[in-house]
């Protein structure tokens, strides 16, 4: 299995941004044309892109849908997979993205509030198109754009959603997200070892060594944002590093 390095294209107000720990107004990067950003990652070797509508995640309104449509259309011609999250609150939201040609829809708050949604989408479109996002803070699940904490642990929820038909999990460690201070591999490893579906890691990657560390957890890939946008390493170097071992 090839460990995938997946560049993040986070959108807020029509721009490509990177926030610190998901806090609005904490932009460390703001670029005017997200479509061009996405195509640039593809030119540099990305096989999958991670698109997030932050307006959707934080306010529940998918304001960046037209931009996502443009990116999907441009990338489909190049055989690049697209996973999309942020503000997918209903079956209709997810279905419209999958019918557009998105490879995987990422359900966060919606899956936790309405687990049947995972089942419905999985049985309609196939589980390979359904990813559940598990965001953890202090070892507990966090929802609503990281503003609310739940009692459950990632392992408990990961097992539950695997049973319900999720084809993969996206695990974000909020404790390290956007800080670029390195990763803590333990929570990711625990989750990987508790389920039999792929786990994509996210949060805190700041060096090529972090990528090697996450690869060793057994994760199927990693979403990288701030480190790529601030030049900690290039995408080419990241892909080369993770394919060496």
Swiss-Prot record:
For the protein in the UniProt heading, the enzyme class is isomerase
Say where the protein is mainly found. cytoplasm
According to UniProt, this protein's pathway is: Amino-acid biosynthesis; L-histidine biosynthesis; L-histidine from 5-phospho-alpha-D-ribose 1-diphosphate: step 4/9
Top-level taxon of origin: Archaea
Q: Which reaction does it catalyse?
A: 1-(5-phospho-beta-D-ribosyl)-5-[(5-phospho-beta-D-ribosylamino)methylideneamino]imidazole-4-carboxamide = 5-[(5-phospho-1-deoxy-D-ribulos-1-ylimino)methylamino]-1-(5-phospho-beta-D-ribosyl)imidazole-4-carboxamide
Q: What is its EC number?
A: 5.3.1.16
**Protein keywords:** Amino-acid biosynthesis, Cytoplasm, Histidine biosynthesis, Isomerase
GO MF terms, alphabetically ordered: 1-(5-phosphoribosyl)-5-[(5-phosphoribosylamino)methylideneamino]imidazole-4-carboxamide isomerase activity
Q: Which Gene Ontology BP annotations are present?
A: L-histidine biosynthetic process; L-tryptophan biosynthetic process
The GO cellular component terms are:
cytoplasm
InterPro entries, per this entry? Answer: Aldolase_TIM, His_biosynth, HisA_bact_arch, Isoase_HisA-like, Isoase_HisA-like_bact, RibuloseP-bd_barrel
| Membership in a protein family | Belongs to the HisA/HisF family.
NCBIfam families named among the record's database cross-references: 1-(5-phosphoribosyl)-5-[(5-phosphoribosylamino)methylideneamino]imidazole-4-carboxamide isomerase (TIGR00007), PRK13585.1 (NF010112)
Recorded protein name is 1-(5-phosphoribosyl)-5-[(5-phosphoribosylamino)methylideneamino] imidazole-4-carboxamide isomerase
């Amino acid at each position: 299995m090839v460990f995938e390095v997946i560049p993040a294209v986070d959108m807020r107000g029509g721009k490509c941004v990177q926030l610190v720990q998901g806090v609005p107004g904490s932009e460390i990067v703001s670029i005017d044309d997200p479509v061009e950003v996405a195509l640039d990652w593809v030119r540099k070797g990305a096989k999958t892109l991670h698109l997030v509508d932050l307006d959707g995640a934080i306010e529940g309104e998918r304001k960046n849908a037209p931009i996502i449509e443009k990116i999907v259309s441009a990338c489909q011609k190049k055989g690049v997979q697209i996973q999309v999250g942020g503000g997918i609150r209903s079956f209709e939201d997810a279905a419209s993205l999958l019918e557009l040609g998105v490879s995987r829809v990422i359900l966060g708050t919606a899956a936790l509030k309405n687990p049947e949604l995972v089942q419905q989408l999985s049985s309609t479109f196939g589980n390979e198109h359904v990813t559940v996002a598990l965001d953890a803070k202090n070892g507990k699940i966090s929802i609503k754009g990281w503003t609310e904490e739940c009692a459950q642990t990632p392992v408990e929820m990961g097992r539950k959603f695997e049973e319900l038909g999720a084809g993969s999990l996206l695990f974000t460690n909020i404790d390290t997200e956007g800080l670029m201070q390195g990763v803590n591999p333990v929570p990711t490893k625990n989750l990987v070892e508790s389920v039999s579906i792929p786990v994509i890691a996210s949060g805190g990657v700041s060096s090529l060594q972090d990528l090697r560390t996450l690869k060793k957890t057994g994760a199927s890939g990693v979403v990288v944002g701030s480190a790529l946008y601030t030049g900690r390493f290039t995408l080419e170097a990241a892909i080369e590093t993770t394919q060496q071992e």
